Design a protein with these regions (language model features):
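Short acidic/glycine-rich loops and adjacent helix/strand connectors
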Residues: 1-157
Protein backbone atom coordinates (compact mmCIF):
# COMPACT_ATOMS: atom_id res chain seq x y z
CA UNK A 1 0.00 0.00 0.00
CA UNK A 2 1.35 3.42 -0.95
CA UNK A 3 0.51 6.35 1.30
CA UNK A 4 1.12 9.94 0.30
CA UNK A 5 1.72 12.08 3.38
CA UNK A 6 1.36 15.86 3.43
CA UNK A 7 2.80 17.99 6.27
CA UNK A 8 2.16 21.75 6.53
CA UNK A 9 1.62 22.29 10.26
CA UNK A 10 4.13 25.13 10.66
CA UNK A 11 7.05 26.33 8.53
CA UNK A 12 7.98 23.34 6.39
CA UNK A 13 6.15 22.07 3.34
CA UNK A 14 6.80 18.32 3.19
CA UNK A 15 5.40 15.49 1.12
CA UNK A 16 6.47 11.86 1.27
CA UNK A 17 5.39 8.59 -0.30
CA UNK A 18 5.65 5.50 1.84
CA UNK A 19 5.21 1.97 0.48
CA UNK A 20 4.28 -0.60 3.13
CA UNK A 21 6.52 -3.15 1.34
CA UNK A 22 9.48 -0.99 0.30
CA UNK A 23 9.52 1.87 2.80
CA UNK A 24 10.12 5.47 1.77
CA UNK A 25 9.91 5.80 -2.02
CA UNK A 26 9.73 9.56 -2.46
CA UNK A 27 10.05 12.73 -0.42
CA UNK A 28 10.56 16.46 -0.72
CA UNK A 29 10.81 19.15 1.95
CA UNK A 30 10.96 22.92 1.69
CA UNK A 31 11.98 24.81 4.82
CA UNK A 32 10.91 28.39 5.48
CA UNK A 33 13.71 29.12 7.97
CA UNK A 34 15.21 31.87 5.80
CA UNK A 35 11.80 33.48 5.26
CA UNK A 36 11.18 33.86 9.01
CA UNK A 37 14.76 34.41 10.24
CA UNK A 38 14.59 38.22 10.40
CA UNK A 39 11.38 38.10 12.45
CA UNK A 40 12.78 35.91 15.22
CA UNK A 41 10.01 33.35 14.79
CA UNK A 42 7.37 32.02 12.44
CA UNK A 43 4.86 34.55 11.09
CA UNK A 44 1.67 32.50 10.49
CA UNK A 45 0.42 34.51 7.49
CA UNK A 46 3.79 34.31 5.73
CA UNK A 47 3.98 30.58 6.45
CA UNK A 48 0.55 29.97 4.91
CA UNK A 49 1.34 31.97 1.79
CA UNK A 50 4.63 30.17 1.30
CA UNK A 51 2.97 26.76 1.66
CA UNK A 52 0.47 27.83 -0.99
CA UNK A 53 3.28 28.83 -3.36
CA UNK A 54 5.41 25.73 -2.80
CA UNK A 55 3.07 22.77 -2.28
CA UNK A 56 2.47 21.86 -5.95
CA UNK A 57 6.21 21.93 -6.70
CA UNK A 58 6.98 19.86 -3.60
CA UNK A 59 4.32 17.33 -4.63
CA UNK A 60 5.84 16.95 -8.10
CA UNK A 61 9.34 16.65 -6.66
CA UNK A 62 8.29 13.96 -4.16
CA UNK A 63 6.34 12.07 -6.81
CA UNK A 64 9.25 11.88 -9.23
CA UNK A 65 8.47 9.07 -11.71
CA UNK A 66 5.77 7.51 -9.52
CA UNK A 67 2.36 7.32 -11.17
CA UNK A 68 -0.15 9.24 -9.00
CA UNK A 69 -2.73 6.52 -9.65
CA UNK A 70 -0.53 4.05 -7.73
CA UNK A 71 -1.20 6.02 -4.53
CA UNK A 72 -3.64 4.10 -2.31
CA UNK A 73 -4.41 6.76 0.29
CA UNK A 74 -3.62 10.35 1.15
CA UNK A 75 -2.71 11.36 4.69
CA UNK A 76 -2.40 14.94 5.84
CA UNK A 77 -1.60 16.77 9.06
CA UNK A 78 -4.92 17.78 10.62
CA UNK A 79 -3.41 19.46 13.70
CA UNK A 80 -2.08 20.73 15.92
CA UNK A 81 -0.39 23.56 14.09
CA UNK A 82 -0.91 26.96 12.54
CA UNK A 83 -4.47 27.11 11.24
CA UNK A 84 -3.69 28.74 7.88
CA UNK A 85 -0.75 26.42 7.25
CA UNK A 86 -2.83 23.36 8.13
CA UNK A 87 -5.61 24.47 5.76
CA UNK A 88 -3.19 24.63 2.81
CA UNK A 89 -2.17 21.00 3.32
CA UNK A 90 -5.72 19.85 4.03
CA UNK A 91 -7.16 21.56 0.95
CA UNK A 92 -4.37 20.18 -1.25
CA UNK A 93 -5.02 16.70 0.15
CA UNK A 94 -8.78 16.99 -0.42
CA UNK A 95 -8.30 18.17 -4.00
CA UNK A 96 -5.84 15.39 -4.75
CA UNK A 97 -8.07 12.75 -3.14
CA UNK A 98 -11.02 13.96 -5.18
CA UNK A 99 -9.01 13.99 -8.42
CA UNK A 100 -7.57 10.50 -7.82
CA UNK A 101 -10.62 8.99 -6.06
CA UNK A 102 -8.49 8.03 -3.05
CA UNK A 103 -9.39 7.95 0.65
CA UNK A 104 -8.22 10.67 3.02
CA UNK A 105 -6.56 10.02 6.37
CA UNK A 106 -6.33 12.99 8.75
CA UNK A 107 -3.33 12.60 11.06
CA UNK A 108 -2.64 14.25 14.39
CA UNK A 109 0.81 15.80 14.04
CA UNK A 110 1.91 14.63 17.48
CA UNK A 111 0.60 11.09 16.97
CA UNK A 112 2.62 11.02 13.76
CA UNK A 113 5.78 11.72 15.75
CA UNK A 114 4.76 9.04 18.23
CA UNK A 115 4.55 6.24 15.63
CA UNK A 116 7.39 7.40 13.34
CA UNK A 117 9.95 4.97 14.87
CA UNK A 118 7.81 2.06 13.68
CA UNK A 119 8.25 3.14 10.05
CA UNK A 120 12.01 2.61 10.23
CA UNK A 121 11.53 -1.08 10.88
CA UNK A 122 12.80 -0.83 14.44
CA UNK A 123 11.09 -3.12 16.92
CA UNK A 124 9.67 -1.32 19.91
CA UNK A 125 8.32 -3.31 22.81
CA UNK A 126 5.12 -2.15 24.46
CA UNK A 127 4.54 -0.59 26.86
CA UNK A 128 7.02 2.28 26.80
CA UNK A 129 7.29 5.84 28.05
CA UNK A 130 8.24 8.60 25.64
CA UNK A 131 9.03 12.28 25.71
CA UNK A 132 7.72 13.99 22.61
CA UNK A 133 9.10 17.47 21.91
CA UNK A 134 7.81 19.18 18.78
CA UNK A 135 7.86 22.94 18.32
CA UNK A 136 5.47 24.44 20.84
CA UNK A 137 4.21 21.09 22.07
CA UNK A 138 5.94 18.82 24.58
CA UNK A 139 4.31 15.70 25.99
CA UNK A 140 5.17 12.80 28.27
CA UNK A 141 3.24 9.80 27.01
CA UNK A 142 2.64 6.30 28.36
CA UNK A 143 2.31 4.18 25.20
CA UNK A 144 0.51 0.93 25.95
CA UNK A 145 0.04 -0.15 22.31
CA UNK A 146 -0.61 1.36 18.90
CA UNK A 147 -3.59 3.71 19.27
CA UNK A 148 -3.60 3.09 23.02
CA UNK A 149 -1.71 5.74 24.92
CA UNK A 150 -2.16 8.20 27.74
CA UNK A 151 -0.75 11.72 27.96
CA UNK A 152 0.74 11.98 31.44
CA UNK A 153 1.84 15.60 31.18
CA UNK A 154 2.31 18.39 28.69
CA UNK A 155 3.80 21.84 28.37
CA UNK A 156 1.78 25.02 28.15
CA UNK A 157 3.86 26.84 25.55
Amino acid sequence: MITLGIETSCDETAIALYDSKNGLIGEAVFSQIELHRDYGGVIPELASRDHCQKITHIFKEALGDINPNSIDQIAYTAGPGLLGALLIGENFAHGLALALSKPLVPVNHLEGHLIAPFLSGDKLDFPFLTLLVSGGHSLIIDVKDLNDYEILGQSRD
